[in-house]
Structures are given as C-alpha cells and as structure tokens.
Amino acid sequence: MKKVVILAGSPHLNGTTAALVEHMLYGAQAVGHKVERFNVATMKVGSCKACMACHKPGGDGKCVQRDDMDKIGPAVVAADVVIFATPLYYFDMTSQLKTVIDRFFSYGESMKKPKEVYLLLACGGPDAKSFAPVTGVFEGICAYLGWTIKGKVLASGCMTPGDLEKTPHCMTAYEMGQKI
C-alpha cells in the first residue's frame, strides 16, 4: 500500500479536472492505496514571501506563514505518490496549484525524497499541443525534486465533464490509479 496525495488545483469542484481526479482516486483506492486529496483552490495558502526565514541558520526550517500549507506540506513529504491535477489556464497550471508548489521551498531537502508523480490535465481547446508548456514545467519541477513522472492524462477538448465522459480519459485515469 502506498501513500498517495492528490493536489487538485481547479476551483471547480464538480468540473472536468475533478472528474479525472475522482476516477484516479477510485482506481488507487480499489487496489488498497491510502489516498489524501487536497482541493488547493479552496484552501488558504499564501504565496511565498521570499523572506528566507525557512532557510536561516539556527532557525526551525519552517515557513513563517501559518495556513493550510501546514497540512499540505507534511502530507506531500510523507507521500510515496503525488498526483497533480489542474485545468489549463493560459498554457499553465492554476495559480492556486502553483502557489502550493512554490511553498515546497520551505521544506528544503525533506521534499527531495523520491516519489512517483502523475499528471491529470484538462483543457477546453482541441489541440493536445497546448499542454506542452505546463508539462515542461512539471518535468522541470520533478527533475529538481528527484521525482519521477510515471503517467499523464492530457484531456484536450474537454471543457465540461460531459465532454470528458465522451472520451477514454476517465477510464485511463482509473486504470492509472490501479497501476500505482
């Protein structure tokens, strides 16, 4: 059994990205994995202030901000698997998800333990090439942290959950969850 953390970046809790998350979550739970889901777009997470308090010699190594990152960060550090889920916003992830990732900085080396990563990405546009910029960002983040991207669902042309249901993406997400 693996510890799986889902960081869902969409503010639409019943939207396309949420549907992908649900399918992958059910797949992972079906084979016995422990899954913790954070809907980061509805949580209170302040942006990094670049104050460097988390890296000051003699300090406690923690971010000075007290917010929902106090729950998210330790869960990610302890996870074996991290699933990033986001709709495409101007060829990138949502700002809410990016804010959480920026705050990984305060966890220093403890965040750099090997993990498996899966991407669940959705966009309304029909061209799958639209995902290239954001997948590049995730590849860079994972390379820096020493994490390995094991799978991706790139759901283009899926503006609504109804659009998504007409594609194989939900089944792909479910099966990917089972293969963790």
Model-derived segments and their meaning:
Residues 44, 124, 156-159:
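Glycine-rich beta-alpha junction loops
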Residues 128-129, 160-162:
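Short active-site-adjacent structural elements
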Residues 1-85, 91-107, 162, 167-180:
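N-terminal beta1-alpha1-beta2 submodule of the flavodoxin-like/Rossmannoid cofactor-binding fold
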Residues 95-96, 106-152:
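Short, glycine-/small-residue-rich phosphate/pyrophosphate-handling segment
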Residues 89-90, 125:
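A short acidic, glycine/proline-enriched capping/turn motif at secondary-structure boundaries
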Residues 7-8, 85, 119-123, 153-155:
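Short beta-strands and strand-loop turn motifs
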Residues 39-43, 116, 153-155:
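A short, structured active-site edge motif that brings together acidic residues
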Residues 138-156, 164, 174-175, 179-180:
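A charged, well-structured terminal subsegment
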